[in-house]
From Swiss-Prot:
EC annotation from Swiss-Prot or TrEMBL: 2.1.3.15
GO cellular component: acetyl-CoA carboxylase complex
Function recorded in the entry: Component of the acetyl coenzyme A carboxylase (ACC) complex. First, biotin carboxylase catalyzes the carboxylation of biotin on its carrier protein (BCCP) and then the CO(2) group is transferred by the carboxyltransferase to acetyl-CoA to form malonyl-CoA.
Keyword ATP-binding in record: yes
The protein, known as: Acetyl-coenzyme A carboxylase carboxyl transferase subunit alpha
Catalytic reactions of this protein: N(6)-carboxybiotinyl-L-lysyl-[protein] + acetyl-CoA = N(6)-biotinyl-L-lysyl-[protein] + malonyl-CoA
Keyword Cytoplasm belongs to the record: yes
Primary localisation category: cytoplasm
GO molecular function ontology, one term from the record: carboxyl- or carbamoyltransferase activity
Keywords for this protein: ATP-binding, Cytoplasm, Fatty acid biosynthesis, Fatty acid metabolism, Lipid biosynthesis, Lipid metabolism, Nucleotide-binding, Transferase
């Protein structure tokens, strides 16, 4: 079983390696006199117990590592598990189609919605094609085009946030990166349809916020949301990225802390060990939250929806 264990999970990795070795040995020689099944079961129970112990006391830096886990489910994974009849739409109708943003119409429990999200890649070629989940201006303009389409057809909007940040390249800046982000912030605040945003991995600065202005903002348990990466903060304050763990703790980037500050509404629990351990389970929990949020927002008239969203934005910074 290959789970790409992180540094703080190495004791778990050692147990899982022993389990794999015993299973391999059992397959090679079925006439062994020892009862391998009992030993494997004992080790599995020990692994679960150890995982619970480690994950009960995670620090902010460890959670940041989990948010970046290479096997963590991405937007298209959640679309596959939660929605039906997904029809992807491409292009910003001005420059190009940015593969770091995916979006289109789909059905959530039979209800038409517009779903938009950042998309990273897993293999090298896919990572490059998706630009490591860092959108250029055309990505945010594509997202806005789909949001405006959703408003015209009175479709709720669901966004999934998972980016280290907007792409900072020269070309992106020349094409108006800051303007594209600012325009999205302005336009999203005035959309006359329900908007539900969920941070599923990294919520990096303006690159995340550009599809993160909504009536409901949720976070998965082991996701992060911040104005800068811990490494970036450490490089500025302490002149060394090695201080990233200290920066992560000081910045308050985790879901429980942000909920305390009333910057997000809900924390969606993940399976033991993180979302990558059981993508279907976390997708089921996320779907339940999305349906509950939609049910709540459906009771509001358009003016009430806009007023509540405005008040939400104006209350940022007040605990």
């Amino acid at each position: 079983m290959s789970l790409n264990f992180l540094d703080f999970e190495q004791p778990i990795a050692e147990l899982e390696a022993k389990i794999d070795s015993l299973n391999a040995l059992s397959r090679q020689d079925e006439k062994l006199d020892i009862n391998i099944d009992e030993e494997v079961q004992r080790l599995r129970e020990k692994s679960v117990e150890l995982t619970r112990k480690i994950f009960a006391d995670l620090g902010a830096w460890q959670i940041a590592q989990l948010a970046r886990h290479p096997r963590r489910p991405y937007t298209l994974d959640y679309i596959q598990h939660i929605f039906t009849d997904f029809d992807e739409l491409a292009g910003d109708r001005a420059y190009a189609d940015d593969k770091a943003i995916v979006g289109g119409m789909a059905r959530l429990d039979g209800r038409p919605v517009m779903v938009i999200g950042h998309q990273k890649g897993r293999e090298t070629k896919e990572k490059i094609r998706r630009n490591f989940g860092m959108p250029a201006p055309e990505g945010y303009r594509k997202a806005l085009r789909l949001m405006e389409m959703a408003e015209r057809f009175n479709l709720p909007i669901v966004t999934f946030i998972d980016t280290p940040g907007a792409y900072p390249g020269v070309g992106a800046e020349e094409r108006g990166q800051s303007e594209a982000i600012a325009r999205n912030l302005r336009e999203m605040s005035g959309l006359k349809v329900p908007v539900i945003c969920t941070v599923i991995g990294e919520g990096g600065s303006g690159g995340a916020l550009a599809i993160g202005v909504g009536d409901k903002v949720n976070m998965l348990q082991y996701s992060t949301y911040s104005v800068i990466s811990p490494e970036g903060c450490a490089s500025i304050l302490w002149k060394s990225a090695d201080k990233a763990p200290l920066a992560a703790e000081a910045m308050g980037i985790t879901a429980p802390r942000l909920q305390e500050l009333k910057l997000i509404d809900s924390v969606i629990p993940e399976p033991l060990g993180g979302a990558h351990r059981d993508p279907q389970a976390v997708a089921a929990s996320l779907k339940t939250q999305l349906l509950a949020d939609l049910e709540d927002l459906d009771t509001l008239e358009k003016e009430e929806l806009l007023d509540r969203r405005y008040q939400r934005l104006m209350n940022y910074g007040y605990c």
